[in-house]
Amino acid sequence: MPGLKRILTVTILALWLPHPGNAQQQCTNGFDLDRQSGQCLDIDECRTIPEACRGDMMCVNQNGGYLCIPRTNPVYRGPYSNPYSTSYSGPYPAAAPPVPASNYPTISRPLVCRFGYQMDEGNQCVDVDECATDSHQCNPTQICINTEGGYTCSCTDGYWLLEGQCLDIDECRYGYCQQLCANVPGSYSCTCNPGFTLNDDGRSCQDVNECETENPCVQTCVNTYGSFICRCDPGYELEEDGIHCSDMDECSFSEFLCQHECVNQPGSYFCSCPPGYVLLDDNRSCQDINECEHRNHTCTSLQTCYNLQGGFKCIDPISCEEPYLLIGENRCMCPAEHTSCRDQPFTILYRDMDVVSGRSVPADIFQMQATTRYPGAYYIFQIKSGNEGREFYMRQTGPISATLVMTRPIKGPRDIQLDLEMITVNTVINFRGSSVIRLRIYVSQYPF
């Protein structure tokens, strides 16, 4: 049978296909060199390789290799003639019998190299670079990588092999970047959010300390993770842009911040007092300066210095009107023997007092009392003059006393003179007389 003879011839030649290097001392894959006989003997892979064929496949040894065929495949068992065997029954040609080494001392003619190799000028089998000779079958999307005796088809970085095609790997799906990821064909790029900078590893992000690099704040910069905040010095407030600071007008917050006047200044404020006052240690309250005590007044030697809240008064000596006579430093008396004194108050006593502007009301401001109580006498207290605005009234607090009450707040500066009359009535001796306290009230300009 010519077909089987050709197969046998190829099988015999396979025993002597030269391996790269020395062809006389090595055998091709699938054969072992018998050191005693110097022959290449076939390896039965079906016995030496565990589970050479799996599943429903069975292993069939052949010269230089083995086959895996389905167990249900029909097996050919026809006649086969072998020049080295008188009888053979099997699905494949039997292995060639050992050939005596003495019959093949050397190989003196060019031989056929294994697949993936070619004979060079020195009759050596060298690797064929299929990638360089463009004799590979890699897909255009793949790259060819030459190997010893063959080649492999692979994909470049950023691609993976799927059904013979190199498809782009979406690295962004796997969290390669710490913050922002942008996929590109065959690769990816990482970026960072505002306030961060990309590290040298190209993946992680580092916070940018804006306060050190650019310091965008007008006053104080505080670095935060991924950003920064601006703070203002005391007395300033942050504007809507979050960067600039503007002066805070503390005086507009409350009218009670200072007792008198609040003066705003950049980043702060201070309280001031009007003339005649000094600022206390609390830096907000004003205290009257007693010009009379400190002799810081302009009164003459004949005048009396009377201190007021925020100022002073120079009071002239009392001058009694006719027919009154001066009987003391501040008292005038009308003589009883004088006929015009019968319908006049017996005495006029001068008194001075001061009140602050806008004092809260009602307020008891002055007390009047009889110095002597006579048997059978009673006393009547009234405001004889000066109360045209009905800002005061007399409230009798006892048989011989009464209190002057301020009923309306009075705004200063203003000077008021009231004649407070005490009428004495004695029914026992049928007597009626009166005395007057001439009260001069000085209302200051300020409510303190």
From Swiss-Prot:
Query: Signal peptide location in the record?
Result: 1-23
Q: How is it modified after translation?
A: N-glycosylated.
Q: List the disulfide bonds.
A: 46-59, 53-68, 131-144, 138-153, 155-166, 172-181, 177-190, 192-205, 211-221, 217-230, 232-245, 251-262, 258-271, 273-286, 292-305, 299-314, 320-332
Q: What is its main location?
A: secreted
Which terms in the GO cellular component ontology are assigned? collagen-containing extracellular matrix; extracellular region; extracellular space
Region annotation (Interaction with LOXL1) maps to 245-448
Highest taxon of source: Eukaryota
Question: Which GO biological-process labels does this protein carry?
Answer: cell adhesion; elastic fiber assembly; extracellular matrix organization; intramembranous bone growth; negative regulation of angiogenesis; negative regulation of transcription by RNA polymerase II; positive regulation of osteoblast proliferation; positive regulation of transcription by RNA polymerase II
Family affiliation: Belongs to the fibulin family.
Q: What does this protein do?
A: Essential for elastic fiber formation, is involved in the assembly of continuous elastin (ELN) polymer and promotes the interaction of microfibrils and ELN. Stabilizes and organizes elastic fibers in the skin, lung and vasculature. Promotes adhesion of endothelial cells through interaction of integrins and the RGD motif. Vascular ligand for integrin receptors which may play a role in vascular development and remodeling. May act as an adapter that mediates the interaction between FBN1 and ELN.
What quaternary arrangement does the UniProt entry report?
A: Homodimer. Monomer, homodimerizes in presence of Ca(2+). Interacts with ELN. Interacts (via N-terminus) with the integrins ITGAV/ITGB3, ITGAV/ITGB5 and ITGA9/ITGB1. Interacts with FBN1 (via N-terminal domain). Forms a ternary complex with ELN and FBN1. Interacts with EFEMP2 with moderate affinity. Interacts with LOXL1.
The name under which this protein is listed is Fibulin-5
Top-level taxonomy: Eukaryota, Metazoa, Chordata, Craniata, Vertebrata
